[in-house]
Structure formats: structure tokens, C-alpha cells
Amino acid sequence: MTKRQESKYKIDRRMGENIWGRPKSPVNRREYGPGQHGQRRKGKLSDYGVQLRAKQKLKGFYGNISEKQFRGIYKEANRLRGDTSEILIGLLERRLDAVVYRAKFVMTPFAARQFVGHGHILVNGKRVNVPSYRVREGDVIEVREKSKQLAIVLEASQSAERDTPDYIEVDHDKMVAKFVRIPAFSDVPYAAHMEPNLVIEFYSRS
């Protein structure tokens, strides 16, 4: 297992869940968190602890977004009219790195962030290298022609894990995706149980 994978799987171990549904996740073999202290019996969490855990899990799923950036997304969701938890999920799923991951151009959110950052993705024919770039309904996202033979792309193209949510249309052969619509929380295929309502409660305390 590479250092990058070890760092990534710390989130799984800390949460005690297989966040991304990956077959190599260490929690498939362990029942405790990272480090020797992870083996101690866990006590019942306070309401704050439950909310914090929900926030850490959702933030971790999207490649462990920085706290500053994640709080900013919450604040934007809170300003908009409607169900704040639904809006939060919609904003997260509109991130370009999230769409690249959902389209299965690469295998993980971490790889998607790096892939976008290195300029391998076009949006409506123009190169975009900002992982947090927000896509709109109807946007076409594709892998640059020169990037289609990269090992990270070939690994994903040969994987059996090619299912994509119905709010993204994907041509896997051409490596082109279309963002059809902003999803509701119930549309998003999380491998682990997510509770965005608790995330809202967490930030509402401050």
C-alpha cells in the first residue's frame, strides 16, 4: 500500500467505516481506529461528537476538503433558499473533482483532485485545473486526448467499478461526461451512511 493510500485510509480507520466502498480498506479487517489508542473501547458520543463525526465523514469523502473551504460551502448553502442540507450536497456534487470521480475517469476523490489540478480535464472544451470549479447543468466534462493513456486513467477504465449516478451521463469509451442535473441527497450513491443534516447542526452551533 502506498503512502498516499495509507494517508487516505486513515479517514476510514478513524471513522471505522469504509467511506468509499473500496475493497482494500483496512476497516474490512479491523474494528478499531488508527494508532494503538484506536483499540480502546469507544464510549457513547455526545450530540456534539455525533455532529462532528458526521462533518468529518462528509468532508473526508470529498477528498478531505480543508475546513476553511468546507465551512465556506456550508455558509453558501445556508444563504440560499431551500433545505440547507440538500443544497450542501448539491454544491459538493457540483465540484469538478467530484464529477470526475463520479464519472469514474479515475478511481478516488483524491486522484480526481490531483487529475484536475494537473490540467487533464476540459469543461465545455476549455481546460480547467481548479478542483473546486463548480459545474452547471448541461456542462460537458472530458479527459484531454493527451491524458487518456495515463496509468491512472487506464486503471479506472479497466475497473469493474464503472457504475455512475443518473445525474451524470457518461461515455466511457470517449471519456466524456455530461452533468445532467443537480442531484438530491437521495440520488447520491454514497458507500457509507451520510447525515448532512447533522453537518448543518454542527455549524449552526457556532
Swiss-Prot record:
Leader peptide range in chain numbering: none
GO CC annotation, single: small ribosomal subunit
GO BP, sorted A to Z: ribosomal small subunit biogenesis; translation
S4 RNA-binding domain mapped to chain residues: 94-154
SUPFAM superfamilies in UniProt: Alpha-L RNA-binding motif
Keywords of the record: Ribonucleoprotein, Ribosomal protein, RNA-binding, rRNA-binding
Domain of life: Bacteria
Segments for region (Disordered): 1-46
Cross-referenced CDD domains: S4 (cd00165)
GO molecular function, one term: structural constituent of ribosome
Keyword Zinc recorded: no
Compositional bias segments (type: Basic and acidic residues): 1-16
SMART domains per record: Ribosomal_S4, S4
Pfam (any one): S4
Subunit structure: Part of the 30S ribosomal subunit. Contacts protein S5. The interaction surface between S4 and S5 is involved in control of translational fidelity.
Record HAMAP family: Ribosomal_uS4_B (MF_01306_B)
Function statement: One of the primary rRNA binding proteins, it binds directly to 16S rRNA where it nucleates assembly of the body of the 30S subunit. With S5 and S12 plays an important role in translational accuracy.
Family per record: Belongs to the universal ribosomal protein uS4 family.
Name recorded for this polypeptide: Small ribosomal subunit protein uS4
Organism encoding this protein: Parvibaculum lavamentivorans (strain DS-1 / DSM 13023 / NCIMB 13966)
